[in-house]
Amino acid sequence: TDNPHLMADGQYEAMLRSLPDVERKRLLEGDWDVAEGAAFPEFSRVKHVVEHFDIPTNWPRIRAADYGYSAPSCVLWGAIDWDNNIWVYRELYAKHLTAEQLADRILEAEQLDPLPHYTVLDSSCWNKTGFGPSIAEVMMRQGVRWTPSDRNRVQGKMEIHRRLADDPYSQEPRIRFFSSCQNIVKQIAGIPLSKTNSEDVDTKAEDHAYDALRYMLMTRMSGYASIHQQLGAIKNHVHKVQDEVFGY
């Protein structure tokens, strides 16, 4: 059992806080989702997972997908708040769906949503193996529009790290996930690093939700997002101390 004297004077908690990320999360926060060798040890259910709330209708929406048939398809929906944070609020995760069937499921899920401002799909879905339409073309014919993803794996991983980190002003992470998005939460918590490339994840692990998230975060957002960036620049300017003596 825990030593009550250590608990009383805070030494025990201080000791737990000094542990490596994975051990600290397990013993101090009770978070056993993050695995040894995980690519994202900074991920925390306490910080990064939230319960459902009604997304404001004026937050731009983004949809991103990784397509598979024998392997699962994953579609993620996110909303961008006025501080340019992303809230991943819905996921669709299923095997053995044709491109037409997946498009129908997406349209069904979005019936009550505002139209997404940004839509991104694995760029390999534009490849053709014969004379027929590509996967992307089939879905677009069904009324589900897409743009090709940026497939840069290393930059995509780094963008996830950046989003998981706290904003220096708000002290809050730049991305959060609804608790109903179980597959992306599971994969971000547990996906391991590559054994041959420390800058990438293990591509042999289940990574379909991870890939969809990577595509989402690598999207070159414009319009509303550029307004968010302008607001962020104004906020940065307001917080910036111009003179160390007088503070202006």
Task: Identify the residue ranges that each predicted region occupies.
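ATPase catalytic-site recognition across NTP-hydrolyzing enzymes
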Residues: 4-67
